[in-house]
Each structure stands twice: as C-alpha cells, then as structure tokens.
C-alpha cells in the first residue's frame, strides 16, 4: 500500500506558533455567525459528518488524555504545574475548566455553556483541540477537491467550511506536545522528550515522511503507537542464530533491527523493551539464560539517567553471548521480546503509592491504584522465536 508523502517545512511557522500558543483563548468570535448546532463543539456533534474520525478518536489515547494516571497527580502538583500539564492533556480552556479552578472564569464558563451545551463528559483532547480556534475550523488540504473548488463550496458547507493549513500534515504540528521545549530539563545532554528531534535527523524526514504518515495513515484518528502490538511489530525485524563453539558452548547472536520507525525505539523515557532468552525443558518449564533491556532508564525524580540503549532508525540492537547447554534438560531455546509501554510510570506510581499513599485522599489514592493497575496490564509479548534442541548446528 502506498502512502502519500507531505513535503512541508518542519520548522515552526507563524500559524503553528499561534495555533499552539498556550493557554489557548476561548471560542468567542463575534465576527463569525454560526447556528446553535454549528457552534456546538461536542465531539458527538462532529460525528454527524465525521463518523469514522469520531469512532477512531474514541479508541485513541487522545480521547483518554484525562484519566486516572493524570487526575491523581492534581493533589500533589502545584497549580502552576497542574495547569502546565493541561496544556497538552486538555488544551481547550473550556475543557480545562472541568478540572482546574484556574480556568473557571466568567468568560470561559460562558464559552463552555455556549459551545458545550450538554456539558463535557470527557475533558480530554477533543476534535476542537486541534481543529478549531475562535470558531474557525482548520484542517489539511482536501483529497477530493481542488483549492478553487473548495473555495467555491465554502459558503454552503457547515460551519463556513474550513481553512486549509498544510501544517496539519507536518510533523511540526505534533511537536508542541510531543517534544520538550528548548528550555526544558535535560539529562545527559538530552531533553526528556526528543521525538521530533530524533525524527528530524533521519532519512524519514529527508524523504518527507511525517509523523502522520505512520501514526495517522489515510488520516486515521487512532494514533497508534507503542501500546499497539501489531503496529510495533511492523517496524521491527528480529533475527538470531546459534553456533557451537570449539569447546562445546552455544553461541547466540541475536539482532533486533528498526526497519520502519522514524525515531528512536522506544522513544521517550517511559517504555522499556525486554529481550529475554530462555532454555525450556520437555515439560515446558523455562529458565532465564540472558536478558537485555532496550530503553532510556532514569530515576523517578527525573534527575539522573542510568542508561540509554534505544535503537536509532535503521540500526540494530545486538545481543551476543555464550552458555553451556545441558542438552538432556533443555529441549528448546526461546527468544522472547516483551514490551512494557508504561515502565517508568509503573515504577514512579509504585513509589508514590508506597511513600505518599497514606497522605493522599481516598479518591486520589483510588485513582492512583487504578492507573497503576491499568498500566501494568499494558504489557505484551511482541515476538517469541523458538529453536529446538538438539539442533543442527555448524561445528
């Protein structure tokens, strides 16, 4: 299947600087005339015309950006820290007003009543978070109409049509929330989030392959990533071999290659990937022989980096070791690759529960416990490769 590539400037331009100028303004715009239905910004309202996008969004992490994992932290963060989190987790001032007293001003509450007349049941990232500013709709170029055709039709389209912005098909559009600011904290010379920078220096960027080409194929609004096994599998290639050494030991050479990922794998400091090698007996019992970890490990206070073993695009993580094989006990060799998408959160949340659990309110503690359980459940086995023993090994 071919993908359409967008050759656009990846530097922040004036549109993006204004579009993501936090905190965002309310949707007040007296110059725009809309009906009550048109001015209703509830995602369910958008679904009347954009059903596929709505259904995809419902299952996405964008639709879950305000959940137990962030809500419990409100009790331990300062107002300033909490509101800063909301810039990306709940960009609209109207949705922020649901979870932050700072945004419960007369102007914002008026705007919320007008544009969300049925209330806001989910104050996460919504359609309007990306597509609407001051009651003007923005989006990528139409795939079916020319610019002239679109201009002719605008007056007859709902909500006065939309303003075409090519930036919607640019990686730079995603940068403000998926890349630490230049002034942000660094560990070992690297920001906590550098996915845009990681991509910018790759062949993917040089070929014009944007974030959207992989994470929004055919403009799909599920934004699949590290939590989706099939999506991750498509970007990696595991291979391994066994040889017998002169003294009878078994030499294992394994390689996990990044073949379709436009940034480091895994990006960010949150996920970890475990490459484990087992010997398995005739009863199916396994014994761990070797383990190698992919990821960027930092402490929970975000003050020290212990290691960074992530794979850069097009490169591989190699594991080579020898061991003495008990051929009577071990019948199979397994190479298992497990992904823990939320490893850092799990470690951090467990520490918070242990050290602060008794200081938290009952509701907040429950949110923390629920989030911790959810994140532990996100682990999955990405690949399992097996070779029988005895095997035909080169001498």
Task: Describe each region flagged by the PLM.
Residues 131, 178, 215, 219:
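Short Cys/His-centered divalent metal-binding micro-motifs
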Residues 1-6:
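Bacterial N-terminal signal peptides
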Residues 167-170, 223-225:
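Outer-membrane beta-barrel translocator/pore domains, especially the C-terminal barrels
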Residues 200-207, 212-213, 217-395:
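Short, conserved sequence motifs used for protein processing/export or organelle targeting and
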Residues 10-168, 176, 182-204:
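Sequence context of c-type cytochrome heme-c attachment sites
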